[in-house]
Amino acid sequence: MAAPTAIRKSTEKSGINEQIQENSTLQSNQALDQNNDDEDMLIDTNAIPTTTVEDQDQSEPSNSLTIQQGETTELQLDESGKPKFSAASKSNMKVKLESRKVAVPPHRMTPLKNVWSKIYPPLVEHLKLQVRMNLKTKTVELRTNKYTTDVGALQKGADFVKAFTLGFDVDDAIALLRLDDLYIETFEIKDVKTLTGDHLSRAIGRIAGKDGKTKFAIENATRTRIVLADSKIHILGGFTHIRMAREAVVSLILGSPPGKVYGNLRTVASRMKERY
């Protein structure tokens, strides 16, 4: 009876071993399947195209648009080979709301009232500023508004009013609004030479001349405008023109005879004609 029982034990052991092997093979196959699935998933995610057919259809017109835009925005050159660019639009530019007060001396209030009808139209129509004359504070008030387009309009308007308060004529002061390269230079006689009493009066007389002939000669030769306000001298004009007029006035203050100054003005006038 011992042999049959021994055989049964061996068969039972072999069956158990087979079940263990089958379980291990199943587990290994499942692990391989999972790895294969993971690999398939990785391959699939990389293989999926990022753009669909609809996206491609939508992207094609955009490419054509960019090409068309590139064709329309070609660089244009002028005759000398320099690139030509279109002017920047002023619609996006905004001017800050600012105000400025220009003080008026007491002796210029009456002339300001008399020619006020000539002063405010260029400020309002040309520079698009708001202007008023304050009689209580004796100032001219300027202010920008939503219709102002020029950034430097307030400064130009203040220079125009300031030129009139210094003694320049309205027609001469309006040139400050039309031209950008005009300036006003002010200096005193004592800055050149310390003079008092009759010596100061004679220096002012030499600058003006008889009936203002010397002053007019300097203005016509140098294309400037000169105002003699007591011991102060105001010159309106371009940078180089102001320098020429200042040299003539300084030479008169230092005592040069008017005849010599006239000779120098003739040479200056001839040079000006050659330049322009």
Curated annotation (Swiss-Prot):
<dbReference type="GO" id="GO:0000472">
    <property type="term" value="P:endonucleolytic cleavage to generate mature 5'-end of SSU-rRNA from (SSU-rRNA, 5.8S rRNA, LSU-rRNA)"/>
</dbReference>
<dbReference type="GO" id="GO:0051082">
    <property type="term" value="F:unfolded protein binding"/>
</dbReference>
<dbReference type="InterPro" id="IPR004087">
    <property type="entry name" value="KH_dom"/>
</dbReference>
<dbReference type="GO" id="GO:0043248">
    <property type="term" value="P:proteasome assembly"/>
</dbReference>
<dbReference type="GO" id="GO:0005737">
    <property type="term" value="C:cytoplasm"/>
</dbReference>
<dbReference type="GO" id="GO:0005634">
    <property type="term" value="C:nucleus"/>
</dbReference>
<feature type="compositionally biased region" description="Polar residues">
    <location>
        <begin position="51"/>
        <end position="75"/>
    </location>
</feature>
<keyword id="KW-0963">Cytoplasm</keyword>
<feature type="region of interest" description="Disordered">
    <location>
        <begin position="1"/>
        <end position="39"/>
    </location>
</feature>
<dbReference type="GO" id="GO:0000056">
    <property type="term" value="P:ribosomal small subunit export from nucleus"/>
</dbReference>
<feature type="domain" description="KH">
    <location>
        <begin position="197"/>
        <end position="249"/>
    </location>
</feature>
<protein>
    <recommendedName>
        <fullName>Pre-rRNA-processing protein PNO1</fullName>
    </recommendedName>
</protein>
<keyword id="KW-0539">Nucleus</keyword>
<feature type="region of interest" description="Disordered">
    <location>
        <begin position="51"/>
        <end position="92"/>
    </location>
</feature>
<dbReference type="GO" id="GO:0000447">
    <property type="term" value="P:endonucleolytic cleavage in ITS1 to separate SSU-rRNA from 5.8S rRNA and LSU-rRNA from tricistronic rRNA transcript (SSU-rRNA, 5.8S rRNA, LSU-rRNA)"/>
</dbReference>
<dbReference type="GO" id="GO:0042255">
    <property type="term" value="P:ribosome assembly"/>
</dbReference>
<dbReference type="InterPro" id="IPR036612">
    <property type="entry name" value="KH_dom_type_1_sf"/>
</dbReference>
<comment type="similarity">
    <text>Belongs to the PNO1 family.</text>
</comment>
<dbReference type="Pfam" id="PF17903">
    <property type="entry name" value="KH_KRR1_1st"/>
</dbReference>
<keyword id="KW-0690">Ribosome biogenesis</keyword>
<dbReference type="InterPro" id="IPR041174">
    <property type="entry name" value="KRR1-like_KH1"/>
</dbReference>
<comment type="function">
    <text>Required for small ribosomal subunit (SSU) synthesis. Has a role in the processing of early nucleolar and late cytoplasmic pre-RNA species.</text>
</comment>
<dbReference type="GO" id="GO:0005730">
    <property type="term" value="C:nucleolus"/>
</dbReference>
<dbReference type="GO" id="GO:0042134">
    <property type="term" value="F:rRNA primary transcript binding"/>
</dbReference>
<feature type="compositionally biased region" description="Polar residues">
    <location>
        <begin position="13"/>
        <end position="34"/>
    </location>
</feature>
<dbReference type="InterPro" id="IPR055212">
    <property type="entry name" value="KH-I_PNO1_first"/>
</dbReference>
<dbReference type="Pfam" id="PF22891">
    <property type="entry name" value="KH_PNO1_2nd"/>
</dbReference>
<comment type="subunit">
    <text>Component of the small ribosomal subunit, ribosomal RNA processing complex (SSU RRP complex).</text>
</comment>
<dbReference type="InterPro" id="IPR055211">
    <property type="entry name" value="KH_PNO1_2nd"/>
</dbReference>
<keyword id="KW-0694">RNA-binding</keyword>
